[in-house]
C-alpha cells in the first residue's frame, strides 16, 4: 500500500473541516469517473498530483481512490481536492493539457476562475514550486490532437464522426463505433441522425433525407461495393471513449420508406458487439425524392443515437487474401507444443505416445482447406479461415471456435504443420494420429459395413427379379397359378418312397402347406391287397397325381406303378426344367377337378358296387384322410341327445394339435358328415388316389382309453371285406413299427366323438365272435357309408371335410394297430340299451345284421378315477344345456378339470 503522506502533505486547512453528504456523493462520483480512464490517462493524473506512474492499472486506481477518500477524514475534510481531481478528469476527456495539481488546488481555494487558472497555467513560466512544466507531458496522440487546438478558443466540432465535440459542460459527443474489417466508413449523412429517448411506453423517431446524385449513382450501381448503413449506439453519460459496439434499442421496428427492415440488428443477448448495422440500400428512392426512415421502440431505459454512413464493403475472400499474406505458424512451433503436451501428460501419470487431430473444420464440419488459428491460441486444432470469416460476417463475435478467446484479424494465421498434412493425405481422411516426433498416420474409416449393405442391396433386386421371372414363365393366362413351395429338405426323402418326411415339426408344417389336389379315377375295391404300399407311396409324394384306370385292372403291378409319382417328384426336385411341365399338369388336374365337382356319375343298375362320384356332399372320405381338431371351430347346431354320445371329450381350449398319434402314415379319423372342419392354415384340396369313392366300408374307431386304465391306443378298425355287406379293411396306412409310439392318455382325449344317430351294421363273424365276444364296444364309433350318404339329406349340409384335409396326413401321427386278442370290457349295466341310439337313424342297408350293443357308461375323461355314480355326471363336468354349439368338436363347458388337464 502506497502511503500518501510520503508524496503529499496538505498543511493548509480548508474552509470546512467537517464532511457533508454532498461531499461524500461528489467523492463517489469522481471515483466512478476515474475508474473509466485508461492507463495512460491515469498516469497523466498521477503526474499532475506528483504520484509515481509505475505500476499496473489497478495500482494507479487504488492510489487515486485513496487520495480522494482521504478528503473525507474527520478534521481534514477537503472539498477542493475532489473538485481539482474532477477538473483534471474533465480536461482529459476533452484532450486538453493538464495543469499542476497544486496550482489548481490553490486557485480553487482562493476562488480564482477556472478559465483563468487554465490560461495562466498554460501560458505562465515555470515556477519554483513546479517540478515540471505547467503543461503535463502527454502521449503522442494527445499531443497531436492538442496541437490543432487554439489557446484562446475551443476547436469547432469536426464533421468526422470519430472526433468528439468539446464544451465546458458534460455534452454528449458523437459516437465512435468499433471498426469492422468487413467495411470502411466513408461519409456521414448529416440528415440521417436520430435520437432515442428514455420512455416507459411506445416511442418513435424518424429522419428524412435526400441523397445527392453522385451518392445515389454510387449506391444504385449493382457492381458497386458501397452501401448505406444505419448505425446505433448507446449514449454513455460519462462520454464516448471510442470503439463503441453497435446496439439498437429492443424491442424495435425499423422501416425505410414504409418497408420493414428484417436484418439481424439485435445480435446475441447479453453480448454487446454481435449486432450488425441495418442495410438501407435496397429500399432507397431516387435522388429526386425524399427518403424516410422510422424507428419504433418501447420501454427504453437508456438513450441511443443513430447515424447513417456510406460504407465500402470488403468481402471475406478479400480478407482471406490478407490472412494468407500474414506470417504462418511455423512447423517447429507446432511440434514444440505437441511435445510439451505429451510431456505434461507423462508428468500427470498418463502414458501418452500419440494424439488424434481432426482435419474437419469445427464450424462447417467439412474438410479444412485453409487451416488457421490465432497466434495466441494454445491448442492444436485449427479451423478453416474462409468459413470463419463468413461466420463473422453473419454474427461478428470474433472469438475462436475452439478456445473462445478473442481473435483480431491481424492475429489470424495459417498453420504450416496442418496445411502440410492436408496437402499430403487423401481427401477422404478425416483424422490423423500424431506422435511426439511430428510423424502422422491417417485414420481411415471402416467401409466394410457400407460395402456389405450395398452388396446386399444389389443382391436383393436380382433375387427378386429371378423369382418374378420364374413365376411368369411357369404360369399361363388361362390356367390357375400354382406355386410350388417344396423345400430342399424333401429332396432326400423323395428318392425313397418308403421313407416318410418326418424329420421335425418345421418339415411337418412344410408338408402340410405343400399338398396339392388329387384326382381319383380308380377303384380301391379291386386293389385291396396293396393298399398299404400304395398309401405309403402317395403320402411321400405331395405333388398332384393322376392315377390311370389301368391301375385298377392290374393288381400285381399296382405297387410298382404307385412308385412312379415318387420318382417323378425326385426328378422334379433335381431338374429345374421339369418344373414347368409339372405345374402345367397340376393346373390341368385342378381345372378338371373344379369342372367335375358338381356332376354325379351313375353306375350300372346291375352292378353290385356302389356308383362313383366326386360330389363332396356324398361324403367320400377315404381312409387316408385324417382330421385333427386344432382349434375350436364354428359348426352347425346338432339337435341330437348329447347323453347318447360315445367318448365324450373335453374341448381343445389351448388350440394345440393333439399328440396322441404320429405322422407316420394316413390313419383315419371319421367325423360326422354334417361337420364342417376348417383348417387353421390354408391347404390345397386333395383326395387319396388309391381309395374308393363310395365303397369305403364302415369303420370302428377307438376314441379314448378305457377309464379303468387300459392302455389300448385309439385305432380306426376296418373289418374284413365281405361281398354281401359294406366292410372295411383294417388300415389304409403303411405302419412302420419303429416309428409307432404310444403317447400319454391325456392327449388321446382330444379325439373327436360322433353322433349316435348314425346307424352301423356289421356282418363279419370274426368281428362279432372273436374280436368282440361280448358285442360291446367301449369308446368305439361305428359308421356305415350308406348311413352317411343319407344323413347328408336330413341334416344341414356343410361340406364334411374339405379336400385340403389330406394335407393333415403328415401332421397327424398314427398309433400302432390294435391287437386282435385284446378283450373288450363289457358294460356292467345289463339294461340292454344299445350303444348307439337308432331312433332317428336312416334305414339300414339290406342283407346286414345289427350287432346288439349295450349302452355304455359315459366317458368324460379317462384320467379321472372312477366314481361310484353310474348315470349322473358331477356338476363340474355336466354338459351345458344352453349351448348352441354341437359337442362333436369338443365344445363342452369345462371348469376346474378341463383347465387342469388341458393345460398339461
From Swiss-Prot:
One of its GO terms (biological process) is chromosome segregation. Gene3D superfamilies: PINIT domain (2.60.120.780), SAP domain (1.10.720.30), Zinc/RING finger domain, C3HC4 (zinc finger) (3.30.40.10). Its main location: cytoplasm. GO terms for molecular function: double-stranded DNA binding; SUMO ligase activity; SUMO transferase activity; zinc ion binding. Residues 162-314 form the PINIT domain. The modification Phosphoserine is found at residues 132, 794. Its EC number is 2.3.2.-. Pathway: Protein modification; protein sumoylation. Coiled coil: none annotated. Changing residue 377 to S: Strongly reduces E3 activity, but no effect on subcellular location. Interacts with UBC9 and CDC3. This is E3 SUMO-protein ligase SIZ1. The gene is SIZ1.
